[in-house]
């Protein structure tokens, strides 16, 4: 224990030494604080060393602190603006310095993005190296190498747009510089980003706001393509503050009018945009910077040329115009001359590269017309897990194929898409098909342009395309973005040679396949059974039959489309029809409603030559026209009628048109040869009736039709009719013949006098009875008063007497209505309750008047009442 104490003593000494050291340190700190306090005594000493002193102790004045805080906030607010301005300056300087030369194609720059790194030796501790790209942006292959804003680049990376496609590499260097472009590229090559990026960057560099109005307009041929462009714009420009609007048909115009003036970017169809230019108040495009025409060839094909010209006239001339198309035709070049200023012609097609994707395998399937649907059903049945698009020539064919194949139930989901559908149903079908991993879409050429259907494996063209451009757009729905794809085009034997020649001119690689008809699944019998059960399907089959033949007849390329070689009867049987429908071609105009296209074209040529003063027509042309007209079976009678308008002259080579004298109605009637065709006035009446039938679709109709068949309603209606007939027609009443009237026609005076005498006697008796009743009532009242005075009262037996009073027939009681009633109703019953004896009935009236009423002492039984009633009745009968 002592040892332990000895060990503890030096520890205490050490603790004391430590405490002394701490005290010395604290003293030193207090001395330093004193010196600081002495230093800050001068409050307004600006030369003081602020870094070594606390700011709160120096600037203890609150006003100075607030001023410094405001300055810091202003600097922080200015930082993003200054950064944005610096970024805009650097991008603009780079665009000026590295702009490609006019007439060059940046796609020719083979050099990849190479960069040299330079190290900065400002300090020895800096180990990082800054990279400076010395390559020009026209040679860029990634979006990050382009002179674009960080907001756009961030959205591109999030949307997984990293590499530039060929059309983007070729067009973006020129469009970012503000040049006009006429670009041509194959479908699925990324043309949408080629004009969306310049729109966003141009408005961003100009610091565009809502008050600046409309800065860019994108015109699309179809609504679906406009919606698709709008979706890409939302994805790429989501970090920008621009307002964008979708202006298409099928939507509420008034809502668009209310919001269109607050938009910066408009994506529209030509018709709806022109409508807003004409109708919307305050619609102003004077500040427009960029105009984009996407799928310009399709816009012109749909007949929007006049609409485009009027739109371009309302836009400012100082603008940037971008025109993109899959094909460049003469009409597009004419449009480019009108709307573009010094354009750059950019095409990504090489001499050895066709306009179709490289990963696309093309097949031509030659088969008869009546085996088309069997071929299609067999193919769908064997490709249930693949995504297929099937193209038809008309809307009626799409509807018929979709309805019948649904009944056949091939085992996959089927979708229809055509121009007769409403806008939002088309949009729903488009979105549903895009989400599906497997399915079949029956569509017209409305789905052939610009629409991006993801992961489409097969494209089947049941009907031959109109031209090679339509073929390119159809097969372009597959093999997009370097993905593999396959296409099958079903051709007739008469269409094979012409289509093969067109594809060989474009240097396309394809295979020709002739399937065995015996191995195909036949659906003719099933279709005929469906049509026999459902009249709607039969109507659709007839319409699809007629629409297909009309589409073939109206084609301009007669080398491919030969209507004379079609087996119409077998084709109608393949659709399930028992007979071939009657067809009448040529309803192009009102003047030639019942004439073929050949005759109407001749009349147009005659009118044109009349206006120019040329009346001569070559006879050779007429002979050719006659041969073509004779080939069409249903137009023989019509053509014979039309030939009467032309008269032969002495010259064999030429024919002259001479004016005919007007004919009377009778002459026209006898000269008429085709009795099945109605006159123009009757056709107008038919169109009016059809319009009225269409209008009646929207009329509200009564639904409770079963009420008309109820028996109750019929009975009530009969009663009402009977009453009305009885009231309105009194002449129909028949009276019964009276037998009392003598044959001489004199009135029965003796009978009338007899009746009068009987009535007078009855009146005397009634008066006597009335007097007796009054007397009895008075006597009864007097007897009651006497009893009260004498102290007696009515016994309970008297009050409870059950009496009966019988009024003679035809006699009315004067007290029924309450007249002369007393307060006590029970007393009245006692007065009238009296016995009638047989002796009283034999007495005269005088003896009855002398008799006085006797009080009732006995209680009357039911037998007594019956006897009194019988006596009373016998007396009245006498």
UniProtKB/Swiss-Prot annotation:
Listed Acidic residues bias regions: 635-652, 816-850
Biased segments, Low complexity type: 16-30, 113-123
The keyword Chaperone is assigned to this record: no
EC assignment: 3.6.4.13
Cited SUPFAM superfamilies: P-loop containing nucleoside triphosphate hydrolases
Class of the enzyme per the UniProt entry, highest EC level: hydrolase
Location of the Helicase C-terminal domain: 372-521
Main location: nucleus
Keyword line: ATP-binding, Helicase, Hydrolase, Nucleotide-binding, Nucleus, Ribosome biogenesis, RNA-binding, rRNA processing
Region of interest called Disordered, as start-end residue ranges on this chain: 1-53, 102-130, 608-675, 781-878
Domain remarks in the Swiss-Prot or TrEMBL record: The Q motif is unique to and characteristic of the DEAD box family of RNA helicases and controls ATP binding and hydrolysis.
Record function comment: Probable ATP-dependent RNA helicase which may be involved in ribosome biogenesis.
The name this protein goes by in its record: Probable ATP-dependent RNA helicase ddx10
Organism listed in the record: Dictyostelium discoideum (Social amoeba)
Encoding gene (name): ddx10
């Amino acid at each position: 224990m002592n040892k332990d104490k000895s060990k503890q003593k030096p520890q205490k000494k050490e603790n004391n030494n430590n405490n002394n050291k701490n005290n010395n340190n604290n003293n030193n700190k207090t001395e330093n604080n004193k010196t600081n306090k002495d230093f800050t005594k001068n409050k307004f000493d600006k030369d003081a060393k602020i870094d070594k002193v606390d700011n709160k102790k120096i600037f203890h004045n609150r006003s100075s602190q607030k001023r410094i805080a405001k300055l810091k906030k202003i600097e922080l607010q200015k930082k993003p603006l200054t950064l944005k301005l610096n970024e805009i300056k650097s991008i603009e300087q780079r665009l000026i310095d590295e702009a490609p030369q006019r007439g060059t194609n940046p796609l020719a720059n083979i050099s990849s993005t190479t960069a040299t790194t330079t190290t900065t030796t400002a300090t020895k501790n800096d180990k990082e190296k800054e990279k400076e790209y010395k390559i020009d942006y026209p040679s860029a292959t990634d979006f990050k190498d382009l002179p674009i804003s960080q907001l756009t680049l961030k959205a591109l990376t999030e949307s997984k747009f990293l590499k530039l496609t060929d059309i983007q590499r070729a067009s973006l260097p020129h469009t970012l510089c503000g040049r006009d472009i006429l670009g041509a590229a194959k479908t699925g090559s990324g043309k949408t980003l080629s004009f969306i990026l310049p729109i966003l960057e141009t408005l961003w560099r100009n610091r565009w706001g809502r008050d600046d109005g409309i800065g860019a307009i994108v015109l699309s041929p179809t609504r679906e393509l406009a919606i698709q462009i709008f979706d890409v714009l939302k994805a790429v420009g989501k970090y920008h503050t621009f307002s964008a609007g979708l202006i298409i048909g099928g939507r509420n115009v008034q809502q668009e009018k209310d919001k269109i003036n607050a938009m910066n970017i408009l994506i529209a169809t030509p018709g709806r945009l022109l409508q807003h230019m004409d109708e919307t108040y305050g619609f102003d495009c004077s500040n427009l910077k960029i105009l984009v025409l996407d799928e310009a060839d399709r816009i012109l094909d749909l007949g929007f040329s006049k609409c485009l010209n009027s739109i371009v006239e309302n836009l400012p001339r100082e603008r940037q115009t971008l025109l993109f198309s899959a094909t460049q035709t003469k009409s597009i070049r004419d449009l480019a001359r009108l709307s573009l200023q010094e354009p750059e012609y950019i095409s990504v097609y090489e001499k050895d590269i066709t306009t179709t994707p490289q990963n696309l395998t093309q097949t031509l399937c030659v088969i008869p017309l009546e085996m088309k649907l069997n071929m299609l059903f067999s193919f769908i049945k064997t490709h249930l897990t693949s995504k297929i698009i099937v193209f038809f020539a008309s809307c009626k064919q799409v509807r018929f194929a979709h309805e019948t194949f649904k009944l056949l139930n091939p085992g996959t989901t089927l979708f229809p898409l055509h121009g007769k559908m409403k806008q939002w149903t088309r949009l729903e079908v488009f979105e549903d098909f895009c989400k599906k991993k497997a399915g079949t879409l029956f569509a017209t050429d409305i789905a052939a342009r610009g629409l991006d259907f993801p992961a489409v494996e097969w494209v089947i063209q049941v009907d031959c395309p109109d031209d090679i451009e339509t073929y390119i757009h159809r097969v372009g729905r597959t093999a997009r973005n370097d993905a593999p794809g396959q296409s099958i085009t079903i051709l007739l034997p008469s269409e094979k040679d012409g289509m093969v020649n067109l594809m060989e001119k474009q240097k396309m690689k394809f295979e020709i396949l002739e399937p065995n008809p015996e191995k195909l699944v036949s659906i003719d019998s099933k279709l005929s059974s469906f049509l026999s059960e459902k009249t709607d399907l039969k109507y659709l089959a007839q319409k699809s039959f007629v629409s297909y033949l009309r589409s073939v007849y109206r084609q301009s390329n007669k080398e491919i489309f030969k209507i004379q070689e079609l087996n119409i009867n077998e084709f109608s049987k393949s659709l399930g029809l028992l007979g071939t429908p009657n067809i009448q071609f040529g309803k192009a105009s009102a003047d030639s409603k019942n004439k073929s296209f050949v005759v109407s074209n001749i009349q147009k040529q005659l009118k044109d030559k009349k206006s120019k003063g040329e009346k001569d027509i070559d006879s050779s042309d007429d002979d050719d026209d006659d041969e073509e007209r004779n080939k069409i079976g249903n137009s023989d009678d019509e053509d014979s009628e039309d030939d009467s308008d032309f008269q032969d002259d002495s010259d064999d080579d030429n024919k002259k048109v001479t004016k005919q004298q007007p004919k009377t109605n009778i002459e026209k009637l006898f000269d008429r040869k085709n009795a099945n065709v109605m006159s123009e006035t009757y056709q107008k009446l038919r169109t009016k009736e059809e319009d009225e039938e269409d209008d009646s679709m929207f009329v509200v109709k009564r639904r409770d039709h079963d009420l008309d068949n109820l028996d109750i309603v019929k009975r009530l209606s009969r009663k009402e009719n009977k009453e009305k007939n009885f009231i309105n027609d009194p002449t129909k009443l028949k009276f019964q013949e009276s037998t009392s009237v003598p044959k001489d026609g004199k009135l029965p005076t003796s009978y009338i006098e007899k009746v009068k005498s009987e009535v007078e006697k009855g009146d005397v008796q009634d008066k006597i009875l009335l007097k007796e009743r009054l007397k009895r009532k008075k006597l009864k009242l007097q007897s009651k008063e006497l009893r009260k005075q004498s102290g007696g009262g009515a016994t309970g037996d008297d009050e409870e007497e059950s009496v009966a009073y019988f009024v003679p027939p035809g006699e009315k009681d004067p007290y029924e209505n309450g007249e002369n009633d007393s307060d006590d109703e029970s007393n009245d019953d006692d007065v009238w309750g009296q016995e009638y004896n047989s002796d009283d009935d034999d007495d005269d009236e005088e003896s009855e008047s002398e008799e006085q009423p006797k009080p009732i002492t006995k209680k009357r039984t039911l037998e007594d009442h019956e006897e009194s009633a019988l006596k009373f009745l016998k007396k009245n009968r006498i």
